[in-house]
C-alpha cells in the first residue's frame, strides 16, 4: 500500500534518477459522489489509472470519505489490467458502489479487446473496500 499525492490530477515518478521510464498515476474522468458511510456530507469514488511504463495499465477504485469537511482517500481497490470502465455509481440507500466494466474472457491474451460485461459491487466497511458480488454476462458484440 503505497501513498501517492496527485498534483493537477496526476502523479509522476521516475524509476531511477537517470531513467526516462516513469510511472504515471492519473485521475480518470470517472468521479461519482454519494453517501458511502451514512454520515453527513457527500463522499466520492474516483477511478485512478496506473501506467507503470510497461505493458499493463491498471485501473483502481479509490474511496474518498468526508472527514471534518474534507474528502480523504481511505481505501483503494484494484479493478483490473487494461479493462474498460463503463460506469461507476453510488447507491445512497445501501451505501454500495457498482462498477460496470468490460474485461477479457478468462484465458484470453492481454492483447485481446475486453468484451465480457462484468458488474462489481462493493461496500465500504471500516474504511476498507469489501467486494460483495461480481457478476459476468456473455461477451458483447463489438463488431457493431
Language model segments and positions:
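Acidic, small-residue rich beta-repeat scaffolds with periodic aromatic anchors
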Residues: 1-9, 16, 86-144
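Flexible low-complexity loop/turn motifs enriched in small/helix-breaking residues
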Residues: 1-36, 40-41, 55, 65-67, ...
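Beta-propeller blade repeat segments, especially FG-GAP/WD-type strand-to-loop junctions
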Residues: 1-6, 56-77, 122-126
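A short, amphipathic edge element
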Residues: 22-30, 77-86
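Acidic/hydrophobic-patterned starts of short beta strands in beta-sheet-rich repeat architectures
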Residues: 36-48, 93-100
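Short, surface-exposed coil-to-beta transition loops
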Residues: 45, 56-60, 82-85, 114-119
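Short glycine/acidic-enriched loop and turn motifs that connect beta-strands
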Residues: 50-54, 104-107
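Beta-propeller fold detector
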Residues: 72-82, 131-136
Amino acid at each position: 500500500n503505497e501513498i501517492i499525492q496527485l498534483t493537477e490530477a496526476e502523479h509522476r515518478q521516475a524509476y531511477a534518477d537517470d531513467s526516462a521510464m516513469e510511472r504515471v498515476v492519473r485521475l480518470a474522468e470517472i468521479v461519482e459522489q454519494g453517501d458511502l458511510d451514512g454520515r453527513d456530507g457527500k463522499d466520492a469514488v474516483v477511478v485512478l489509472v496506473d501506467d507503470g511504463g510497461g505493458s499493463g495499465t491498471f485501473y483502481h477504485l479509490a474511496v474518498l470519505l468526508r472527514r471534518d469537511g474534507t474528502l480523504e482517500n481511505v481505501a483503494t481497490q484494484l479493478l483490473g489490467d487494461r479493462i474498460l470502465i463503463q460506469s461507476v455509481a453510488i447507491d445512497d440507500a445501501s451505501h454500495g458502489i457498482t462498477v460496470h466494466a468490460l474485461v477479457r474472457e478468462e484465458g484470453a491474451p492481454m492483447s485481446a479487446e475486453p468484451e465480457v460485461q462484468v458488474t462489481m459491487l462493493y461496500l465500504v466497511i471500516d474504511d476498507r473496500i469489501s467486494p460483495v458480488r461480481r457478476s459476468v454476462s456473455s461477451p458483447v458484440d463489438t463488431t457493431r
